[in-house]
């Protein structure tokens, strides 16, 4: 078992996947605050590794996200973008790790009283969000600081995880990691 945080990649096989829809809904609540309304995300430049936002329709049905996990597999943070390919997602994580000092954290108020989350931006573009709601602003700030510290030195996995239905068993791997990465 690893003693350090890791960045894992999760691939979705359909844009209608309920886990993707849940992720989009949560992200929408996080970015509905001032972060999303005051700052206009820049359009990606040619060759840019930043993922597309899922609301712009530019991503494919086979898409994925990344998640920052603690050594005990607890989610510390997640990508703010949906990525069309595994290669783009992994390249963006490596690019972000090199620029952690440029990251700006903002706490946001959730959809109901007593819920708080956080969003991290680089150059006014949201790149990472909390993975859950917190009960207090101070807990939110502490969680964000911990996520940023972990992200700086997190191990970046070499392959994506294919999402499976809740309660279903993961099939034995019949294809290699390269083939799985290519399918996303």
Report the location of each language-model feature.
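Negatively charged, low-complexity tracts enriched in Asp/Glu with abundant Ser/Thr
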Residues: 1-43, 69-97
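Short, charged, intrinsically disordered terminal tails
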Residues: 2-6, 10, 150-184
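Short aromatic-glycine-(Arg/Gly/Cys) micro-motifs in beta-strand/loop hairpins
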Residues: 5-8, 19, 49-77, 109-127
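A short, exposed loop/beta-hairpin motif centered on an aromatic-Gly-Thr core
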Residues: 74-85, 126-139
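A short, charged, amphipathic alpha-helix used as a generic interaction element across diverse proteins
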Residues: 84-101, 136-154
């Amino acid at each position: 078992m690893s003693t350090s945080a890791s960045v894992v990649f999760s691939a979705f096989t359909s844009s209608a996947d309920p886990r993707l829809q849940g992720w989009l809904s949560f992200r929408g609540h996080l970015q509905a605050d001032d972060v999303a309304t005051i700052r206009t995300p820049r359009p990606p430049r040619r060759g840019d590794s930043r993922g597309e936002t899922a609301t712009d329709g530019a991503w494919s049905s086979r898409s994925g996200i990344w998640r920052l996990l603690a050594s005990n597999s607890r989610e510390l943070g997640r990508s703010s973008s949906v990525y069309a390919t595994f290669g783009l997602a992994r390249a963006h994580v490596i690019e972000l790790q090199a620029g952690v000092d440029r990251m700006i954290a903002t706490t946001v108020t959730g959809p109901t009283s007593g819920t708080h989350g956080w969003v991290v931006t680089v150059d006014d573009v949201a790149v990472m969000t909390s993975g859950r709601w917190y009960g207090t602003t101070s807990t939110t700030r502490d969680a964000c600081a911990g996520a940023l510290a972990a992200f700086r030195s997190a191990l970046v996995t070499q392959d994506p995880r294919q999402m499976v239905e809740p309660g279903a068993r993961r099939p034995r791997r019949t294809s290699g990691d390269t083939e799985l990465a290519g399918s996303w």
